[in-house]
Amino acid sequence: MPKAPYVEQQFEDLEQQTHTATLGMWTFLATEILFFGVLFACYTMMRMRWPEAFRHGSEDMKIWIGGANTAVLLTSSLFVALAVRVAKLGNIRWLIRYLGMTAILGVVFLGLKSTEYYLETKEHLVPGINFSTISPEEQGKPPAEQHPRPEEERLFMLFYFIMTGFHAVHVMVGIGVMLFLIVLARRGHFNSTYHNPVEIGALYWHFIDIVWVFLYPALYLLRQG
C-alpha cells in the first residue's frame, strides 16, 4: 500500500513542496554548470595557446572507449526518462527496473573509464605520476627514431584527468541517487500522484549525461590544431 507523501511544516501543501524541491535542484544544477563551465573555459584557452600539444593529446585518447561510454550514458538517459514516465503512471515494478538499469549502466560507464585510466597509466600519460614525452613503445628505439610527445601535452592530460575525474564522481553520486530511489520505491513512497523525487533524480542524471556529451568531443574528437 503506497504511503501518503509527508508535507514538511514549512510548506502549505504538497504542490508547494514539490515546486520548491524542483526549484532547488535547478538552482543546484546552475551552480554545477558554472563549475564545469569554468573548467571548459580554461581548457579552451589553453587549447588555443598550445594547439599542437592539445591535438596530440586528443590523438592519445582511446576514442573507442569514449564512444562506448557515450552510448552507455545516452542509453541510461533513455532508461531514466522511462522511469519518470512509469512513475507518473504509478507502475512501481517498472520504475524499479528502469532505475536499476540506469544504475547498472552507470557502473558500466565507471568500469570502462577505469579501464581507460589503467591503459593511460601504462602509456605514461598521468601528470605528476609517470608522464613521459617518450611513450613505452618508443623507449627502446634510438633517439633519432623516437617521436616524443610535446611537453605541453602534460597540460592537456591534467585537464583530461581533472574534468573526467570530477565527472566520474558525479556519476558515482548519480548511481547512489538511483539506488536510494529504488529503496524508496520498494517501500511504497511513490505513486501516480507523488513521484517528485524520481523527477529530481532524473534531472541530475540528465545533467551528468549532458556534461559528458560536451566532454567527449572536446577531449576525444577535436584532433585538429
PLM feature spans:
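...captures the hydrophobic TM-helix bundle architecture rather than a specific catalytic motif
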Residues: 1-225
